[in-house]
């Protein structure tokens, strides 16, 4: 086998942002047939070898029978999670000549694979889409859910990939996929049946007035009083009277939730501002991470 090199564009999550990672696959090297993974992979990334092997064979494709080196370039950056399964599998297919695609550089690709070859959800779809747009990539390939988050980013084609087989047929031109459209238009329907309501507060005229002024002007507010006087009860009801986030704020909120793996239901849960109530004894590290 002549040595062949394939490069697939992917990403790594760094906090709530994504940074570029190149998945380089080199097959046909002389030596004992085995797979070597380099580029600071963590345990989940190292295990991708076994997942990719099963996913390829269950998709009717084959692993190379030569020594193969996979490098996750951006080598000083720690790679975490199973998001490189799909780019590694596609890199192996390109390097072994099982997939011919002459416009691979147009795409940013990430996704976890199950043993059957189906894709599984990943964190940080929105951050990866923002990165793909910054890198001037034409399109991004992501598993379901992550793809729906990514569709919120304008100026980028987002394709939802459900299996390795579908990805190979799409990239080789045998299959046409329709890019996802942004779910922003559906932003009006949100059911708030169980939200605490500011109208539930009985009495407390002075506190209510202070809260309304703070919310209207975007000010900080401290409530001091004995236990049971209603501080927490009032605080829980403040999000209900805050204005809905602007589109930019909405994307910022979503980026944080996406990086934490807290996916949105159908795309638009955050028409109300998220409220967090850390305990007053919390340490700095617990609060800020």
Question: What name fits each language-model region?
Answer:
Residues 222-264:
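Walker A/P-loop
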Residues 1-236:
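Peripheral, non-AAA+ core regions of ATP-driven protein-machinery
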Residues 155-162, 238-245, 276-282:
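Short, exposed beta-strand "edge-strand" segments with a Pro/Gly-rich flavor and a Y/T-containing core
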Residues 93, 168, 239, 251-255, ...:
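Conserved protein kinase catalytic domain
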Residues 196-209, 218-220, 249, 255-289:
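Switch/coupling sub-region of P-loop NTPases
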């Amino acid at each position: 086998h002549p040595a062949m090199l394939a490069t697939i564009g992917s990403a790594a999550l760094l906090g709530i942002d994504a940074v570029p990672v190149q998945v380089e696959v080199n097959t046909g090297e002389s030596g004992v047939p085995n797979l070597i993974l380099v580029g600071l992979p963590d345990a989940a990334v190292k295990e991708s070898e076994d997942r990719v092997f099963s996913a390829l064979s269950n998709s009717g494709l084959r692993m190379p029978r030569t020594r193969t080196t996979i490098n996750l370039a951006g080598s000083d950056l720690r790679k975490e999670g199973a998001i490189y399964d799909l780019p590694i599998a596609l890199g192996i297919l390109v390097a072994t000549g099982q997939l011919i695609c002459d416009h691979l550089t147009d795409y940013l690709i990430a996704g976890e694979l199950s043993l059957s070859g189906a894709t599984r959800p990943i964190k940080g779809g929105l951050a990866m889409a923002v990165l793909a747009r910054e890198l001037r990539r034409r399109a991004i390939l992501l598993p379901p859910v992550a793809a729906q988050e990514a569709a919120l980013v304008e100026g980028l084609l987002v394709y939802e990939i459900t299996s390795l087989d579908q990805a190979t047929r799409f990239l080789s031109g045998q299959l046409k996929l329709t890019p996802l459209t942004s779910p922003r238009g559906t932003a009006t329907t949100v059911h708030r049946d169980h939200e605490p309501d500011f109208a539930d507060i009985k009495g407390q005229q002075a506190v209510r007035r202070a809260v309304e002024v703070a919310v209207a002007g975007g000010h900080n507010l401290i409530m001091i009083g004995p236990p049971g006087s209603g501080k927490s009860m009032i605080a829980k009801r403040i999000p209900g009277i805050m204005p809905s986030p602007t589109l930019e704020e909405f994307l910022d909120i979503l980026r944080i939730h996406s990086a934490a793996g807290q996916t949105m239901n159908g795309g638009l849960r955050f028409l109300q501002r998220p409220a967090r109530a850390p305990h007053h004894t919390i340490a700095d590290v617990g609060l800020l991470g």
